[in-house]
């Protein structure tokens, strides 16, 4: 699995985990956050490796559907990019400290 996919799934899980069942949360948390293998998760829950795989794949698809409709991750990335640009622009201003403090306050609101 690519690092890019893992990072994306971690973000999607972070944004949308409240919409998942407790089993989906557990499987995704163990697989993506705790780096458990499918076999280790299957052993932990006394189910087949295939059952874990199917559950994780369905959950990944659900997370992608949520993102397609709600765009929380996309908007997060856009805000992050805008904050970076604001910081770059503020670094050339005389009121840099005030501008930087304002930007940092905005970032904390996220």
From Swiss-Prot:
**Gene3D superfamilies attached here?**
Winged helix-like DNA-binding domain superfamily/Winged helix DNA-binding domain (1.10.10.10)
Entry's InterPro entries? RNA_pol_sigma_r3/r4-like (IPR013324), UPF0122 (IPR007394), UPF0122_fam_protein (IPR054831), WH-like_DNA-bd_sf (IPR036388)
Superkingdom of this entry's organism?
Bacteria
**Entry similarity comment:** Belongs to the UPF0122 family.
Function as written in the Swiss-Prot or TrEMBL entry: Might take part in the signal recognition particle (SRP) pathway. This is inferred from the conservation of its genetic proximity to ftsY/ffh. May be a regulatory protein.
Q: What protein name does the entry list?
A: UPF0122 protein RBAM_015800
Species annotation = Bacillus velezensis (strain DSM 23117 / BGSC 10A6 / LMG 26770 / FZB42)
